[in-house]
Regions:
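Bacterial Sec-dependent N-terminal signal peptides
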Residues: 1-34
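N-terminal, active-site-proximal structural segment of metallo-dependent hydrolase catalytic domains
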Residues: 15, 19, 30-96, 109-114, ...
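Active-site metal-binding loops of divalent metal-dependent hydrolases
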Residues: 42-43, 79, 182-184, 218-219, ...
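Active-site environment of divalent metal-dependent phosphoester hydrolases
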Residues: 46-47, 81-85, 112, 186-188, ...
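Sec-exported extracytoplasmic/periplasmic mature domains
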Residues: 67-71, 92-98, 125, 201-208, ...
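Active-site neighborhood of phospho(di)ester-bond hydrolases with catalytic His/Asp-centered motifs
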Residues: 75-77, 103-106, 214-218, 251-252
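Structured beta-strand-rich core segments of catalytic domains in phosphoester-bond hydrolases
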Residues: 77-180, 184
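Metal-dependent phosphoester-hydrolase catalytic domains
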Residues: 190, 194, 201-213, 221-315
């Protein structure tokens, strides 16, 4: 091959790399902070009888995927807290993420037994505000542990939320982010709509209204559902009344992949469905650099019954 051909080949090979460098450089000029890496994952509860896909047979694979991403924040759903260490998913995941703190409690009456919507955060970079953190229930009595209002709802649903202060070399930078993690109901459409409304009301009423928001969750409904459209700022009819969302979120995946059609996130340990029911939402002031549905397999098996999703966010 002649010198000119080699030069041409090198130019072609370098173009994608150069484009990525230019893109990241552009974001770094527009947004002063280091990007925020986020993962949302429904871990599939450890107490389920899943045969070959039982928790004991997939937990190492799943935590390998979580750890590999070097994430700032990880929102997990169906994360079991249990006195039995073999079933305690929060404890196991924590043991594999030594550099991360963890915040969350069970959605049931007992804070340490049941499924939790857990937030893992990188301790080197983030300090959780002890005065601005909460778990609330998606019910008419949000401060009552284990509460639910809709009789058609499958179980109590909760939201874990906290304000985080960014650190650099152990000192606050002055920059802050709110993080919310939830799991909407799988049985009742009305419960999902009420849950979405209550979540958006709480976000709009947060203490520091100028601080941007990240929301992770298994919403159990597709992109065109009333609950998701409401979270993105569209009106929703509930109780024969039209409600206007008090806050507007952006779907990070759609920001990065507006034309994607292969977007199913529930796989049932088999083949994925067509609907995207897992989300990472962000405030409009935050910009998505990249977002992905992680379909990694090991020996023909998935790490959980939902595909993990991640996003890299500029701020």
């Amino acid at each position: 091959m002649g010198a000119s051909a080699v030069t041409a080949l090198n130019n072609i090979t370098m173009r994608p790399f150069c484009f990525i460098v230019v893109l990241l450089s552009a974001f770094s000029c527009l947004f002063a902070g280091e990007p925020i890496r986020v993962l949302s994952i429904n871990v599939r509860l450890s107490t389920a009888n899943d045969g070959e896909n039982n928790w004991s047979k997939r937990k190492e694979f799943m935590t390998d995927i979580i750890a590999a991403g070097n994430y700032d924040f990880i929102g997990t759903q169906e994360t079991v807290m249990n006195p039995d260490p073999e079933r305690n998913q929060v404890s196991y995941i924590s043991s594999k993420l030594a550099g991360h703190g963890v915040f969350g409690r069970s959605r049931e009456v007992s804070p340490e037994v049941g499924e939790a919507m857990t937030i893992f955060y990188k301790k080197e970079r983030w300090n959780m505000d002890e005065t601005d953190q909460t778990t609330f229930w998606l019910s008419d009595t949000p401060d009552v542990a284990g509460s639910k209002t809709d009789p058609k709802a499958g179980c109590p649903r909760s939201v874990t939320a906290a304000l985080f202060h960014e650190l650099k070399e152990g000192k606050p930078t002055g920059r802050k982010i709110y993080f919310y993690n939830t799991h909407l109901d799988h049985m009742s459409e009305e419960a999902r709509q009420r849950g979405a409304k209550q979540l958006m009301d709480r976000i709009a009423a947060r203490k520091n209204k100028d601080v941007p928001v990240i929301v992770t969750g298994d919403m159990n409904c597709g992109e065109r559902s009333p609950a998701i459209r409401f979270m993105k700022g569209e009106p929703m009819t509930l109780d024969e009344k039209e409600w206007i969302s008090p806050y507007k979120l952006t779907d990070s995946f759609r920001s990065a992949n507006p034309d994607a059609t292969d977007v199913g996130t529930f796989n049932g340990f088999k083949e994925p469905g067509k609907s995207k029911i897992d989300y990472i939402f962000v405030s409009p002031s935050l910009k998505t650099i990249s977002a992905e549905i992680i379909r990694t397999q090991r020996d023909g098996r998935y790490p959980t019954d939902h595909f993990p999703i991640d996003a890299v966010i500029a701020w």
